[in-house]
Amino acid sequence: MNNKKILILGAAESGVGAAVLAQKQGFEVFVSDNGKIKDNYRKMLIEKKIPFEEGTHEGAAKLIAPLNPPLRGDLAQSSNVALPQSPPEGDLGGLEIIKSPVIPDNVPLLVNAREKGIPIISEIEFAGRYTDAKKICITGSNGKTTTAMLTYHILKNAGLNVSLAGNVGKSFALQVAEENFEYYVLEISSFQLDGMYDFRADVAIITNITPDHLDRYDNNFQNYVNSKFRILQNQTKDDYFIFWSGDEVICKEIEKREVKANLLPFDLEETDDTFAFTKGDQLIFKQIVLSAITGKSEKQQITKSTNNQINNNQQTNQPYMTMELENIAIKGVHNLYNSMAAGLAAQVVNIQSDKIRRALETFDGVEHRMEYVASVRGVRYINDSKATNVNSTWYALESMQTTVVLILGGEDKGNDYAEIADLVRKKVRTLIFLGKDNEKLKKFFANFENKEQGTKNKDSLSATNNKIKIIETKSMQEAVDAAYEVAKHGDTVLLSPCCASFDLFKDYEDRGRQFKECVIKL
């Protein structure tokens, strides 16, 4: 039995997975969840004989601040189920906390632990200690789920022994405990990165960085940026960093930091530095001279020159792969960026070009991300519930070729709606606010006027200069019913909320499912 004790805060996918892995590694484990544990996770804890509590953090607090006499009776009394085995004793020696990413760092329990010098880490950090698999890690403000799932799709269809984990798919820790994969594609949020210290990404991807979750970062954008760049913190000269070179925030951060990994930028336009770009109607990937990650061939040195510009030594101009843009399965400029990032990651792990091309042509997309639901009375309904920040909604609106009825709102995260103001004026007929508190939205969008230029539907806004209609709703059914009433033939009803979902829904998935259910019933 390992002498270290593991306290896990949060008994959902990541927490229970971490508990199973910790138990397998011989640690004493105790799981604490302040809410109600879902039946499937409770069943797993009981079957594995892992002690836990729910509806309280009382037991967890006692482990952090040990009391006498021993805690078993107190813990069992505070739990909603009998403990299958004794919880860890209240000795701080060797205690480590693995916390759910949804728990803020400033809750008193964690503040107390930090003051006592108790390490607090994420499930990703913990699981990374116990696998030698190659890890392709994706973060960013937008596009990380699509990029992760597309990368997984390419690798899986190429025959690699690969799994999907992190912020999507099954728990990384549970898979490390029970499976033996050679590759992991990990979507990693900023909250997960905040609890990562020694974890090393063999391939790191940052899709983009725009303001998001600022309420968790003291409303300081640089704090959020620093969190995203933690994905690079332990990379070496044998690793790779894939990024969009059109993102000014990312490029400025690269100039400020010592990035040891090979740099693989991509953009719409070709430069001397880009490894993926478009030319006419073609998507083009340049050849990468592979490094130690695949053990195949001589490493390509890609470094920064003294003037902080990206400098590619030994770069070949020979194309690795080309394909017609119209054959890429997922549409829109944002998905073109996602395809470039995933394609470069696949090339790094030595996937043949024809397999990358075929996978890009067959990927079905991600549920709740620009997902087509149905057409009713000549109106298309699109579910973009995963758009929980302004930049995501910007990309959604930018891709629209018709007049839009836009459903937005929810739990504001310090949003600056000015980023979508021009697109709203050009493309939106009606704004439908969906949330408990719509005051910030109403104040910003009051008196907006249509200035549409060139939509394809026959009832174009360009003939008028009308004030954009605003409708307030408090449920998804109300929002969909309102959209049905105001949308005209040829319009698109777009659910792209800009905001978190927790004011009215369990999560963005619940919000998206309710939208689809309401649309199907029209």
Task: Map each language-model feature to its residues.
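C-terminal helical cap/extension that packs against the catalytic core
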Residues: 38-46, 421-490
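Nucleotide phosphate-binding/pyrophosphate-handling subdomain across enzymes
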Residues: 2-5, 15-25, 300-303, 323-429
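Beta-strand->loop->alpha-helix junctions that form or flank phosphate-binding loops
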Residues: 53-57, 121-125, 260-278, 359-361, ...
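N-terminal leader/targeting and accessory segments in enzymes
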Residues: 1-68, 74-84, 91-122, 126, ...
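Intrinsic disorder/low-complexity segments
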Residues: 60-95, 287-322, 447-468
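Phosphate-binding loop of NTP-binding sites
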Residues: 4, 23, 84, 101-261, ...
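Short internal beta-strands
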Residues: 28-35, 241-245, 407-408, 427-436
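Extended acidic/charged loop-beta regions that coordinate divalent cations
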Residues: 56-59, 178-216, 252-308, 312-325, ...
